[in-house]
């Protein structure tokens, strides 16, 4: 378990606004931490608490 997250490491989860989990793959883009899309992908950027930049973002389709 990630001590900063309510899910097992690597599993899907919903994170709080103060999310610090690094290995978590959060399922909700707008109310959780997620890997953020490049600047051109505004869908993912809105309300997303970035935990790192990514050029592969499922929220960006």
Curated annotation (Swiss-Prot):
GO terms for cellular component: cytoplasm; nucleus. Monomer. A divalent metal cation 7 binds at residues 50, 57, 59-60. A divalent metal cation 6 binds at residues 37, 41, 44, 60. It comes from Oryctolagus cuniculus (Rabbit). The modification N-acetylmethionine is found at residue 1. A divalent metal cation 5 binds at residues 34, 36-37, 50. Keywords: Acetylation, Cadmium, Copper, Metal-binding, Metal-thiolate cluster, Phosphoprotein, Zinc. A divalent metal cation 3 binds at residues 15, 19, 24, 29. Gene3D superfamilies: Metallothionein Isoform II. GO terms for biological process: cellular response to cadmium ion; cellular response to copper ion; cellular response to zinc ion; detoxification of copper ion; intracellular zinc ion homeostasis; negative regulation of growth. Residues 30-61 are annotated as: Alpha. A divalent metal cation 1 binds at residues 5, 7, 21, 24. This is Metallothionein-1A.
């Amino acid at each position: 378990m990630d001590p900063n997250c309510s899910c097992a490491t690597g599993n899907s989860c919903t994170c709080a606004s103060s999310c610090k989990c690094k290995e978590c793959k959060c399922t909700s883009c707008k109310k959780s931490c997620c890997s953020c899309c490049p600047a051109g992908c505004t869908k993912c950027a809105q309300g997303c608490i970035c935990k790192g930049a990514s050029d592969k973002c499922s929220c960006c389709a």
